[in-house]
Amino acid sequence: CDKTEQTVYCLERATGEIKFSVLTPFENPSGLAFHKNSETGEEVLYVAYAGEELYIRDDPNSEDPFQLTKRDRTFIHPLSFHYNEAECYALSNGFLIEMSYVEELSPLDEVEIDNLEWRIALPSETHRQKVRKITPVGMPFTEEIVEGERVAVFKFDRLMKGERRIFGWKALLEVRSIKYQLSPQDVEKIPKLSPEFEAKYLVDNDNLAMDTEIVRSAAVASIGTETNILRQLLSIRNFVYDQLSYGIRPHIDTPDIVLRRGIGSCGEYVGLLLALARLNRIACRTIGRYKCPAFADRKGVPLEPDFNHVWLEFYIPGFGWVPMESNPDDIQDRGPYPLRFFMGLAWYHVEIGKGIRFQSLSSGGVPLKKEDVSVGTLAINHVRFTILEELM
């Protein structure tokens, strides 16, 4: 196993070649052992984890008694996994989680809107994520299918001044970690992108500043002489990590501004990655929207994420969409950078509305412009997760 990569490797006994790898549900894996169940005869792989955790220390002798500090943490946990060799991916420890997304109407300005339709994307069905059940919260909704994704539509005959209510959805989800098992040799000979994909995923349709000199120059520099799609993506990712440091911003700036500033949020990392990849004719799209707080041992406790989160997927012709994280692997200045979330996602990612807008507003069937009225000026969102059980 590899502590930094948060990964366990399965090797070919005779040659030592990697057959497949899986992500661990916790950070800092440091030891492995198989144990045979005496009753069933089944062998279970256990992983030892050794690291540090933050906690609030109560110091009665201090003027400020509650202090944030670290302590050692060591424990053992079984690792379950499944390798789908035919489709080139491996799944590991899964969890049944309940996620609720609720909007609380609280307009900054008094507005009235007739025939308002408020659309909120619903969780997706993927290799690593299965939707067991979705129920409405606060008021009923109808469902639409947009580009293969489920969308909840909340309808208001008239949104009145001073109106207050909550509405949203609650989902019961099975989520697992996934790691795609592709090498550059596997994608040496791939077909060309279809014209439909070129028109949709190689264009600047999200303020990516792809026509600016600084971004176009970065696109050339980012891949060097690489021609293989995986090596190109990895080179682009490492280039972006070299150029940026992570920092929360109140709003998302365009990639040209982000490059000059050298600091970006997850959304700004994604914007720059999208721009450079698309300029190098690699189809890609934004994916998100939330991460369950990564406390897999806190079952039955409501958990609240501090922020939303986005990452991206790139398309390999002849294979399909493959995930790539935005900033979490940018862990040290100038690298080297781990590969744990290159073609992989941890169990705590929740994929919602892949390739479509997360939320949108319309009145009488006409989309409302963000400059006139936006979701952020109408409501406050509330997101909660509860880990119900571990899936074996």
Q: Over which residues does each language-model region extend?
A:
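Acidic low-complexity segments
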Residues: 146-148, 161-260
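Conserved beta-strand positions in repeat-built beta-propeller and related beta-rich domains
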Residues: 1-4, 45-50
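Hydrophobic/aromatic-rich core segments of domains that either
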Residues: 268-367
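Structural signal for beta-propeller blades
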Residues: 6-8, 53-55
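Short loop/turn segments that connect beta-strands within beta-propeller blades
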Residues: 12-16, 60
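Surface loop/turn motifs at the tips and blade-to-blade linkers of beta-strand repeat domains
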Residues: 21-26
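Intrinsically disordered, low-complexity N-terminal segments that are enriched in acidic
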Residues: 63-179
